[in-house]
């Protein structure tokens, strides 16, 4: 179960919000009193998410869009929802190609979603923090793949390593204005997609053999890390990359 946090009257933008980790972050924030702005491409899933929160103080506000859109489009989609007090850059894609099979299209798409989008959205939100003197928090959802290499994941690993450096650079630039920026770096997470992708026993064993804690992460374990970093409980934490990986990155 997610830990108890109070985000009453806070407005939090979450990308990649229509399924998996992003959806559960939205629901947990809404239950903790936040006004959640849920950004994703899948309109049907977003509307379903809104229905799940109709009994709460705030319903979730959906934004249908793609984080890889250009800066002008992102501005038009996001800025009307200011002020925002927190951002979770959760949207991301994974590519699985061995060297010799990687395409330029795969590289461009992966970096557009996993790096360029988070930078542009963080920049918009940070301007909102500064203009309104908000002590805001940004959490980027990265991966254990930013810290340790994974076979056949060169493009994905490179994109998440780049995102971790974005976290550190933003933390360095924005800290003097009381804006915190951190990353959460999970292992495989037991979403529906995670269960499907890691159902093969041999594939699963190969990964678990590298982990001191011999299991994959539950969604709540990632959500708890995100809510902690968004909250005032983490008021002295910035520039961190927080592994939720059962010790994978320690080996």
Swiss-Prot record:
InterPro entries: L-xylulose/Carbonyl_redctase, NAD(P)-bd_dom_sf, Sc_DH/Rdtase_CS, SDR_fam. One of its GO terms (biological process) is glucose metabolic process. It catalyses: xylitol + NADP(+) = L-xylulose + NADPH + H(+). Substrate binds at residue 143. NADP(+) binds at residues 13-42, 160. It is found in: Cell membrane. The active site is at 156 (proton acceptor). Disruption phenotype: Reduced life span and impaired egg-laying function resulting in the retention of eggs. Exogenous addition of serotonin, which triggers vulval muscle contraction, or imipranine, a serotonin uptake inhibitor, rescues the ability to lay eggs, showing that the morphology of the vulva muscles and HSN neurons is normal. Belongs to the short-chain dehydrogenases/reductases (SDR) family. Catalyzes the NADPH-dependent reduction of L-xylulose, D-xylulose, L-(+) erythrulose, D-erythrose, D-threose, L-ribulose, 1,4-dibromo-2,3-butanedione and 2,3-heptanedione. Also active against isatin, 9,10-phenanthrenequinone, menadione, 2,3-hexaenadione and 3,4-hexahenadione. No activity observed when tested using NADH rather than NADPH. This is L-xylulose reductase. The lineage of its organism: Eukaryota, Metazoa, Ecdysozoa, Nematoda, Chromadorea.
């Amino acid at each position: 179960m997610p830990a108890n946090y109070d985000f009453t009257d806070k407005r939090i933008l979450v990308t990649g919000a229509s399924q998996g980790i992003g959806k559960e972050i939205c629901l947990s924030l809404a239950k903790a009193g936040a006004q959640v702005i849920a950004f994703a491409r899948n309109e049907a899933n977003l509307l379903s998410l809104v229905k799940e929160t109709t009994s709460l103080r705030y319903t979730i506000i959906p934004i249908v869009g793609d984080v890889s859109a250009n800066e002008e489009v992102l501005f038009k989609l996001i800025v009307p929802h200011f002020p925002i007090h927190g951002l979770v850059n959760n949207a991301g894609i994974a590519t699985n190609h061995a060297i010799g099979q990687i395409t330029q299209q795969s590289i461009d798409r992966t970096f557009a979603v996993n790096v360029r989008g988070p930078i542009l959205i963080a920049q918009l939100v940070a301007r909102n923090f500064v203009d309104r003197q908000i002590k805001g928090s940004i959490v980027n959802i990265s991966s254990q793949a930013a810290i340790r290499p994974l076979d056949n994941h060169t493009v994905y690993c490179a994109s998440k390593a780049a995102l971790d450096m974005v976290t550190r650079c933003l933390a360095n630039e924005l800290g003097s204005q009381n804006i915190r920026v951190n990353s959460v770096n999970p292992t495989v997470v037991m979403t529906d997609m995670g269960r499907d992708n890691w159902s093969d026993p041999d594939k699963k064993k190969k990964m678990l053999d590298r982990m001191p804690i011999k299991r994959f992460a539950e969604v709540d374990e990632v959500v708890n890390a995100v809510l902690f970093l968004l909250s005032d409980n983490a008021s002295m934490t910035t520039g961190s990359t927080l592994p939720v990986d059962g010790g994978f990155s320690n080996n």
